[in-house]
Amino acid sequence: MDDDEKKDMCPICKTDRYLSPDMKFLVNPECYHKICESCVDRIFSLGPAQCPYEGCDKILRKNKFKTQIFADVDVEREVDIRKRVFNVFNKTIEDFDGDTAAYDQYLEEVEDIVYGLDNGIDVAKNEEKLRTYEELNKQLILANMERNKQTLENFEQRQKFEKEIKLKKRQLEKQIEDEERANREWVKWEIVNQLTTSEDAEQVIENVKKTVKLKKSSARRKLEELNKVLRNNPYMTISNGRMKKQEHVPFTPFNGDRDRHKRYVIDEESYHDPVVKELQTKKEYIASGFRAEYVYNRVLTEAFMGLGCIIQDELQPS
């Protein structure tokens, strides 16, 4: 019998998945031996019992059995160990007031415990560390669990919020596209109709353009408002508010990147740039991440970046 056939057969009752397609395999974190669901019900329904695998003396309970997620049992074991350890050692960098060195040391100690438990090294010692830490830090562990739960809820709300906004954006973009297509057709016919009664072609075209400009719906304005809402995502601000205080800026050799006080202010409302505004409405540009503020920021940064650099002074020998 090859390995593939063994994977689909219960080693206890020898039932094959081919004959029982609905058969489920379960494992117990005590020993991670694979047993089918029927054998678990049959052997452990009356209470704790010894693992039916030959040579395994672990006492197993029915309520501890779970569905195996990973095909590799070693991976399954490590994931379970990490989950158990991280539920106790659940500090974040916020608990260290932004001290990355202390936080890294803490993570290293946690990884040592995980490695020891996963590889059977000083298991009793590592279990004692885990138990002692849990007893001494119950309040902190519960507080961090509540905070992590809140962070997850904020993340899910943010995902839902962004999904709804993006759906509305797609609907508005489709509406704008349909209106523009209809306007183009209308312009062609309107120019032809007006030229039948007027000889001034330039005036006719100018009048039609003005009419089209007035006919532009509120969909475009709504789309711009949605883009502003996405840029000023309230959930993003909440989740990142505390981390911004501890933001670490990496070193770069470019001149001007340490100037935190910008010498310019971007006012998109009063600055009219028809080229960039038109690009903002095109799907291929939006899909690639194009934003008007990125363009303005880059151009103005390049313009102001070298103001503090005197070339002659830089060229002088030190």
Swiss-Prot record:
- UniProt keyword annotations, A-Z: Metal-binding, Nucleus, Transcription, Transcription regulation, Zinc, Zinc-finger
Is Secreted found in the keyword set?
A: no
Q: Where are the zinc fingers (RING-type)?
A: 10-55
Q: Which Gene Ontology molecular function entries are recorded, alphabetically? A: cyclin-dependent protein serine/threonine kinase activator activity; zinc ion binding
Localization, per the record, is: Nucleus
Q: Pfam families attached here?
A: MAT1 (PF06391), zf-C3HC4_5 (PF17121)
GO CC term, one of those recorded: transcription factor TFIIK complex
Chief localisation class:
nucleus
* BP term (GO), one: DNA repair
Taxonomically, the superkingdom here is Eukaryota
InterPro entries annotated for this entry?
Answer: Cdk-activating_kinase_MAT1_cen, MAT1/Tfb3, Znf_RING, Znf_RING/FYVE/PHD, Znf_RING_CS
What's its job?
Acts as a component of the general transcription and DNA repair factor IIH (TFIIH or factor B), which is essential for both basal and activated transcription, and is involved in nucleotide excision repair (NER) of damaged DNA. TFIIH as CTD kinase activity and DNA-dependent ATPase activity, and is essential for polymerase II transcription.
Name of the protein this chain belongs to:
RNA polymerase II transcription factor B subunit 3
Provide the taxonomic classification. Answer: Eukaryota, Fungi, Dikarya, Ascomycota, Saccharomycotina
